Amino acid sequence: KRQALHCVDNEGEVDLEGNLKISWKYTGIELAKSIMSKPIKEIGKKVIEPMILHQNKYETDKRLREAYEEFKKLPLTTICKIARVKTFNKYSDGSSGFQTMKGMQAHVRAAYYHNLIIEKEKIHGVQPIREGDTIQVIALKPNNKYRIDSIAIRDGYMPPEFLELFEIDYRRIFEKPFYACIASLYKVANWTPPNVTDEYEFELFDLFGEE
């Protein structure tokens, strides 16, 4: 079940002023999951909640573009997908170099690439990712010498060597899961979502600006 509910009467629950407590409940959609950071969820709510209340496509499109502008200004580690590596040992043991084991999930593959790259590039001071770790998954443009399209980091630390080796694909980071979540609600409303990533270009200063 995927839904966003606007609850205007939660079994008579009231606020401090005695008014009925109005709340929102998200089930199944990305805003209800741990794959998104809290700042990203808050940006998403600024689009979704007025969308449901007012059902105005023009205003929703405007808010989605504003959300994109906010998104671009957040630190890299805030905007990336969050995941926990639960099957790392099984799939890393079954892989050899860049030939990864069939059935390996994308976030596990990104974690595996992290360890492989720090070994191949002899990057010191960066701990390998292990089974059970929580990671951030970074989308990459595949025009790098290793031809990989994602890599994971741990504890929010992006090694400078990674930035020299890889070009980060911010458009893909925005499109999934954030934009995909909003677009699914556009589909329910029978609207066509604006392609905001084609209308604007990322500014590197914003993306690597101060946290």
Regions found by a protein language model. Give the residues of each.
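DNA-dependent DNA polymerase catalytic subunits
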Residues: K1-E211
